[in-house]
Amino acid sequence: MKTRFFTLATLALALAACNNDNENLNGDPVAAQFTADIAPATRASGTTWTAGDRIGITDIGNDSQYGNVPFILKNGKFEAEGKVIYIEDTKTHTFRAYYPYNAVGGILTATTDATAQQNQPAIDFLFASGATGDKNNPVVSFTDKTAKGGEDNSFHHRMSQITLTFEAGDGVNFSVVKPERYTLDGLLLTGTFNTADGIATADNGAQTGELTMNLADGNLTSSIILFPQTVASLPLVVNYKGQEYHATLTMPEGALQAGNNYTYTVKVRNKVLEVSEATIAKWNDIDGGEVNAGL
C-alpha cells in the first residue's frame, strides 16, 4: 500500500437556471445542475474523485422532497442521477452532502476489518454542510471560504486513519526480505456513520479485536481507516523473517479523532521494534514518531 496523505475534499456545486442567467426573471423554479471543481480536491484514501463516484445531497429545509438525492461523477462533473433538485421559492436554501452515497441514508453500519480495508473508499466517509443558494444567487459552493471571512463548507474526512512506515534499523536489511504483515490489537472495528450530521461513531458496546494487514508486494507503508474511538495505546506485532516483533503505539490525546491521520515510523531492529511518537495532521497527518519493534 503506497504512502498517501490526504487533503480535505472540496466540491463546488453550481445551480444553473434554465435560461443560463444567474437571475431568475420569470419566477420559475430553478433547475439544479450540480458541477464539481475537484482540482485539487481529493478523497477516499488519497485518490482523486473517480468517474462513477456518487454523493448524496440534501436540501436541509426541504428534505422531504429533496433528501439524499444521488449525484454521480460523469466527465468530471457531478450530475443528477435521475431526480433533479429545484429551488422553487425566494428563500435561501442550505445544503449538505456526504460520500459515499447510500440509497437508504440515515445511520449506516459499517466494519473496518481486513476485508473492508481492501476497499477503503467505501469506508472513507466524507461530509460537507452549510453551503447556501437561492434563485437569484444559485451557486452553492461546498468549499472552504474562511480565507474570505466565510465558513468552511468543504468536505471533511469523518473517520480516523493510522499510517505506518516500516524502516530497517540496526542489524536488519530489507533489501532481500521485508516485513510480511502487522497486527494491531485493541481496536473497535465496527460502528456507524450518520449521513445527516456526518458523525462516525465506533460501536462502544462491541468487543475490541485485532486487525491484521499484509504488506503485499514489498510495500513498507500501510494505511488503515478506522472509526474514531477512545484508546490510549495499541499493541503492535510485526512479522518479519518468521519472528514476531512487539511494540506499542501511543495515541496522542488518548483517542483517534475524526479527520486525523496518525503517522508512525516503525524501525525493525535486531531484536526490538522502535516506534516514533505520532504526528497528527488534517487527513490531517499526525506524526506518531518512531516505534522500535522487539522480539
Residue map of PLM features:
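Positively charged n-region of N-terminal signal peptides that target proteins for export
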Residues: 1-5
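C-terminal motif of bacterial Sec signal peptides marking the signal peptidase cleavage site
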Residues: 14-17
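Bacterial signal peptide processing site
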Residues: 19-22
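Short, low-hydrophobicity acidic/polar segments
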Residues: 24-178, 183, 207-226, 230-232, ...
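Surface-exposed loop/edge segments in extracytoplasmic proteins
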Residues: 62-72, 190-196, 243-248
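Conserved structural position at the C-terminal beta-strand
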Residues: 99, 238-240
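Edge beta-strands of extracellular beta-sandwich domains
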Residues: 106-113, 244-252
